[in-house]
Amino acid sequence: MTLSRGPYSELDKMSLFQDLKLKRRKIDSRCSSDGESIADTSTSSPDLLAPMSPKLCDSGSAGASLGASLPLPLALPLPMALPLPMSLPLPLTAASSAVTVSLAAVVAAVAETGGAGAGGAGTAVTASGAGPCVSTSSTTAAAATSSTSSLSSSSSSSSSTSSSTSSASPTAGASSTATCPASSSSSSGNGSGGKSGSIKQEHTEIHSSSSAISAAAASTVMSPPPAEATRSSPATPEGGGPAGDGSGATGGGNTSGGSTAGVAINEHQNNGNGSGGSSRASPDSLEEKPSTTTTTGRPTLTPTNGVLSSASAGTGISTGSSAKLSEAGMSVIRSVKEERLLNVSSKMLVFHQQREQETKAVAAAAAAAAAGHVTVLVTPSRIKSEPPPPASPSSTSSTQRERERERDRERDRERERERDRDREREREQSISSSQQHLSRVSASPPTQLSHGSLGPNIVQTHHLHQQLTQPLTLRKSSPPTEHLLSQSMQHLTQQQAIHLHHLLGQQQQQQQASHPQQQQQQQHSPHSLVRVKKEPNVGQRHLSPHHQQQSPLLQHHQQQQQQQQQQQQHLHQQQQQQQHHQQQPQALALMHPASLALRNSNRDAAILFRVKSEVHQQVAAGLPHLMQSAGGAAAAAAAAVAAQRMVCFSNARINGVKPEVIGGPLGNLRPVGVGGGNGSGSVQCPSPHPSSSSSSSQLSPQTPSQTPPRGTPTVIMGESCGVRTMVWGYEPPPPSAGQSHGQHPQQQQQSPHHQPQQQQQQQQQQSQQQQQQQQQQSLGQQQHCLSSPSAGSLTPSSSSGGGSVSGGGVGGPLTPSSVAPQNNEEAAQLLLSLGQTRIQDMRSRPHPFRTPHALNMERLWAGDYSQLPPGQLQALNLSAQQQQWGSSNSTGLGGVGGGMGGRNLEAPHEPTDEDEQPLVCMICEDKATGLHYGIITCEGCKGFFKRTVQNRRVYTCVADGTCEITKAQRNRCQYCRFKKCIEQGMVLQAVREDRMPGGRNSGAVYNLYKVKYKKHKKTNQKQQQQAAQQQQQQAAAQQQHQQQQQHQQHQQHQQQQLHSPLHHHHHQGHQSHHAQQQHHPQLSPHHLLSPQQQQLAAAVAAAAQHQQQQQQQQQQQQQAKLMGGVVDMKPMFLGPALKPELLQAPPMHSPAQQQQQQQQQQQQQQASPHLSLSSPHQQQQQQQGQHQNHHQQQGGGGGGAGGGAQLPPHLVNGTILKTALTNPSEIVHLRHRLDSAVSSSKDRQISYEHALGMIQTLIDCDAMEDIATLPHFSEFLEDKSEISEKLCNIGDSIVHKLVSWTKKLPFYLEIPVEIHTKLLTDKWHEILILTTAAYQALHGKRRGEGGGSRHGSPASTPLSTPTGTPLSTPIPSPAQPLHKDDPEFVSEVNSHLSTLQTCLTTLMGQPIAMEQLKLDVGHMVDKMTQITIMFRRIKLKMEEYVCLKVYILLNKEVELESIQERYVQVLRSYLQNSSPQNPQARLSELLSHIPEIQAAASLLLESKMFYVPFVLNSASIR
C-alpha cells in the first residue's frame, strides 16, 4: 500500500536508477575506505544528490523554495555536498535560527533564509541527521520562538520567494568532551523595510541587523576553524567585470585533483543580489592537518570546467573544479580530518589559540562586502564517529557530556567577547578605509571592483563572519551582557548603514547634474537607492560563447558600442563609485546580476542545467514582488499576463515528458519585465536568456531579414514516443512598430527600475534606425528588454524598452506619435488582400506571430489550441487585421493592430496590382496556386499542411525554432514550416479528416473559401479601377476620397446582388466592416483622431451601416423567395441552414474571448455612439440576416466590433458556422476532430426529441449503482478469506461490470473487437472515478437527508454519514472555485479518510494509521472529493453524466471519434433545452472536469488501491 509519487514513467525511473548507480560508483571511489555507500535513495530527498540528475530534481526539490514549511529529511550518510537553494535577499534583519543541541553531542548545521515580503521570515528547512534532531524556527516580526528538540519549522505566509538552505555538519566524537557544536545559520528577508526578524528573543537570537540599503552579513557559524594550512584563493576576474552575483563552488583545500561535488543551487528571486556559496569537504585526505580554503571577492565567476554559474535566471547550478573560482559570497572547504581533530578537546584548545593569533594578525585588513553560506560535506566517516542518540534525555552519560560542553562554552565565551571588541574596531577601520578607497577608484578597469587587498581579506572575512554569529552556539547559557553586546553591534550596524545611505545620496546628487535621465528613473524607482546596475563594457560583452556562435551579428553592435564607449566609461566610473559605497562590512553586493553574465569563453555551448519548472513556484516567487514594486492597474495587468503566460507550463510536458533545460535558464518560464511601465500588460520581454542579457543585447541584427533576430535559444529536452528530442523555444520580440523619439522619454520616465544610460542611448539610436527601416518591426527588442532589475524577480518595470504597446493595449497614456505611420498602408493592404502583401514587404518584414513558447504539437493534436495565434481562435481568418487586433492584448501586437487606421484618413493606400503579378506563397514565397486552408499558398505548403494535420505528425526543431522558411530550404525544418503555417493563419479545422478528394467542390468550408477567393480577386479588380480614377482626381480631399471609395464599393455589390446573394453578403459585410475599421480603429483605446475626424468617421460609418441594413432586408426577402423559407432549408446549405431555435444559440467561444470582445464592443460604443443609430426593428432584422447570411464580422476581434455594436454580446464574433469551425470553448477538452464543420454528415443538428431518446437509451443500459458499489459489502468486509483473494474478486467484478455495460451500449456493434478490448484496458479507471464522483453527487444528498440506509444499518453509524455531513455547510455558487480550505471539502475528505481507515482496518485485519493512509491515498481522495463536490455544486444531471461517460470512453480514439462527436451533439442539443440561457457555457463546464477525472484516475492507478472508490460508495450506503 505504498503510493509511488514520482511523476515519471517506468523508463524515467530506469534511467534515474542508472544515474544513481553511476553516482554511487563515482562517490564510492572518491570516499574513504570505510565501506560506507550512498544512502538509500528511497528515504532521502533527491535534492541531496550532487551533481543533480535532471530527472531527479522534479520530485523533491520543488519544496525547497516554496513559501510553505517543508522539512526535508536529510539522510546524512551522503558522501557529498548537500546542495540546497540559498538566498541572501536585500534589506533585512537577520532572524537567526534557534538550534537546540540534543543530548547526544551531535548538531547538524541548519541554515534558514528569510523570504520576500515586507518583514517576512522565510522557510526553515531542518536537517535531521542520524543522531539527534535539530530544531530551527524562523521568526516573524515581534514574535519570539522557542527552540525545541523535535523536528520543526515555521514559515511566514508572506515568504513566497524564500529559498531555504540546509547544510549539515555534525561534529562530535565518541569520547569528545569539549566539542563546540557547529551550526550554520544564515537568515535573511527580502522586504522593503528594515526589520524582518524579532530582536527580542531571549537566549535564542543573535542580533545582526541592517538598514534598508545594507543587507545583513549574518553568515555562518561553524566549529572553530583551523588556522593551519589556510589557503586563500583570490578572485581572478578574467575580462575584468563581475559576472553576476552567482553561486560558485570551489574545489580546493586538500582535494587532490578530484572533481568538485559541491553544488550550489541559487534559486530565488531577490531584489539585488543572488549571492550564495557552497563548499565541499574533500574526502579523507592524506594529511593530518586540517585545511580551510576560503574564497571571497566580487562576483567574478570564471569556472574552468565550463559550467556556468548564474543567478539572474532564478536558478543556477555551478560546479567548479578549481580554486580559481570566486563567488559572490564565501565558500569554505573543510576537510574531514578537521572534524576528527576537533573532536578532541586538547586539539580544540590549540585551534582556539591559533585562531586568536590569526585574527590578531589580520585585524587591520578591510572587511569583505558579501555574506556567504557554508555548505559542509557530510561523509560516512564522520557519521561513524558520532555517538548514537541517547535513549533518554535524562541519562547520566548525556548529562555529563552536557556539563563538559558547558565548561567549553565558558572558556570560549571570554574569547568571543574579545573578538567582538576587535570586530567593532575592524568595522570602524573598514568604514574609513573604504571611504578613502572610494576616492581612488578609477572607472575603466573592472578588476578594481574587488575590495581592497584580497589575500588577508579572505581570511579575515571568514573569521569575521564566524565571530558575528559565534554566540549562536552559546546562547543557551549566555548571560544578559551577551545580548547587550549584540544590541550594541546592531546599533553600530545601523549607524554604519545610515552613513552609507547618506554617502550614497550624496553620490546620486553628483550624478544628477550629469545624468538627469538616470536620476529621473531613480526617482520613479521604489528601490532606487538600492539597485545599482553595472553594465559591462565592450570588452566584457564578447566573452560569452553565444557571441562566438553568432559572431557575424556582433559586427553591427561593435560599431554601435564604439560610438558610445566614452559615455559608457563615464557611466562605469559613477557606477563603480556607487558600488564601492556598498562594499561596507554590512552591505551586500547590490550590483545587478542580470546584466553581469561573464562566462568563461572556453566552455562548451550546451551545458546541462537543471530548472524547477513548477509554475506555482514561479508565481509564488514572482507575484508578491510584482505587487510590491508597482501599484494599481499596471501591477494587476502584469500579474494577469504573467499568470496567463505560465498556464501552458503548469503541468508542462514538452512532447511527452517534463522539460529539462539545456543551454539556457528557460526564460519563457519566468516573466521578465511584463510591460507594467506603460500601464499595459501586453508587452513581454522577449529575451529568452535573462541570465546573459549582456550577451543577448548584441544579438539583434540591424538588417532586414525574413525571420526575427535570434536570441539565445532555450533548449528543452523532451521525449516523444521513447525518443529523446530537443525543443528550442524562444520568446518573440514584440514588434516595436517604428517608434519615434517622442516615445522614449516617456518610457524612460515610466520605467520604475534602472535602465542604464547606455541602454537609453541604444534605445534612441535604435529608434532612429527603426524609422529608417520601417518594415522591420521587431528590431531592437532584445536590447530593450535587458534590464530585468533584480535577479529573477518578477518586476513590472518597462524594461521592455521600445516594445511598448502602441495601440490596442489596456490603458497607458501613449502619445499620437506612438502610432506607427508606416504600418497603415501595409495594414490596409493586408486587410484587402487577405494577408497577401507585396513581395518586398514580406521579405523585409518578420511576421508578427511568433508563438511565445515552443509549439507543442502533441498537445495541439490533443485539442489544446491555446498555442495557436488568437486570430485562429476567432474566425476563419477572413481578414488579416482580425489576427493582429485580436492578439493585441495577448501577444503585444498593438503596434500593428492599433496603428492600422491612424493614417487612413490622411493618406489612403494605393490599391495593389496583384492580378498582374503572380501570387506568392505566404509560407515559402514560392509561386502560389490559390487560397488553401485560409491563406494563399503554393501546392507544396498546402500538401505539407494537409498531411501534417491528417496524420497528426509531431515535429521537432534542432535549432531555436526560428528557421527561415524559403522555397530553397522549406524542407529542412518541418517543425518551423508547420509553425509558420499556423502563424500565417492556416486553419486546422479546414483540413478534411476523411481524406476524401474533392474538397474544393463540396462542404461548407470550401464554399466559404471559394467565395472568399472570388471576393479577393474581384475586390482587387475594383480597386484598380478606382485607383485609375483617383489618380485623375488628385484635387479631391482625402476624407471625401475615403467616402467615395466606400460608396463605389457598395454600388458594385448592389449590382451583383441578384447574381450571387451569398457572395454579396460576404463581400458587403466585409467591406462595411473594412470601412469602419478604417475609420474607427483607434477610437476606443486611444483617442488619436481629432474631433472633426471622429465625427466624420462616425457619420460615414453610420451611413454605411444604414445602407447595409437596407440591403439585409432586401436580401432576406430574396432569400425567402428563392429558398422557400428559412426552416425548410437543407442543413448542409451554407446560408440559412439554421433552425429557429438555433438562431439564439451563442457562438462557441471561450469566456476570455467573449470578455475581450465585450470590452472592445463597449469601448467602441462609448467612443462612437453614432454606430447604434438604427431602430430596434432594423437591429432585429440585422441579427436574423447575420444568422442566415453569414456576413457579420468575419474579421472578428475588436476591429469589427464597431459594426456589430448593436448585436447581442454572444453574436459579436460572427455566425454559428464560422465559430463551429474554430470552436474555441471546447479546445481544451475535445481532441482535434472538428470535421463536424467540414463533413456535411456532421453538420446536421440532432433534434431535442432524438437527443432525449439517445440519452434515455444510455440511462437504461447504465448500471450506475452496480458499477459504483460492491454488493454485500458487509459480508465482503467480514469475510475472513485471504486479502489477495478479496482483491481479485473486486477486480473480476470491475471487469465483468464494465464489459456488461459496454455490450449494452447502442453503438457497441460499431466498435471493433480489438478497440473494445483497448477501451476497457485504457479507460476503466477513468470511468470508475467518474461513476464514483457522479454517484455520490447524485445520490449522496438524498441519503444524507434521509439519514437511513438501504441495508438497514442505523443512521448513527459513522460510515453512513460521509456524504451527508458536508451538506449542512452552505454550498457556494458553482462558479466559485473549490479551495483546499473549503469547509465542505475538508469535512468530506476527513469523512472519506475515516471511512477508509475503518473499512481497511476491518479488511486487513490489522489497524492502519491515518498518517499512512494519507500518505498512500490522501491525494487521490482529495481529487475524488473535489470532483464530487464540483458535480454537486453544478447540479449534475443523470443525462449529462451518461453523455460524459460515453465521451470519456471514446476519448482519444481516432476510430471512434465520429461516435464521440455524435454524442457531443446529443449533449449540446439537450443542453440547449435544459440550459437555454447559456448551453455552451454548461457544456464547457461539464467538459472542464474531464482533466480532473483523468488526473484522479492516474492517481488511482499509481496507488494500486483500485478498491478505494468501491469502499467509499459501498460504505456510504451500508
Swiss-Prot record:
Basic residues biased stretches: 1061-1077
Pfam families: Hormone_recep, zf-C4
Residue ranges covered by zinc fingers (NR C4-type): 921-941, 957-976
Source species: Drosophila melanogaster (Fruit fly)
Segments of the chain annotated as binding DNA: 918-993
Disruption phenotype: Flies exhibit larvae that precociously leave the food to form premature prepupae, resulting in abbreviated larval development that translates directly into smaller and lighter animals.
Descriptive protein name: Hormone receptor 4
Coiled-coil stretches: none
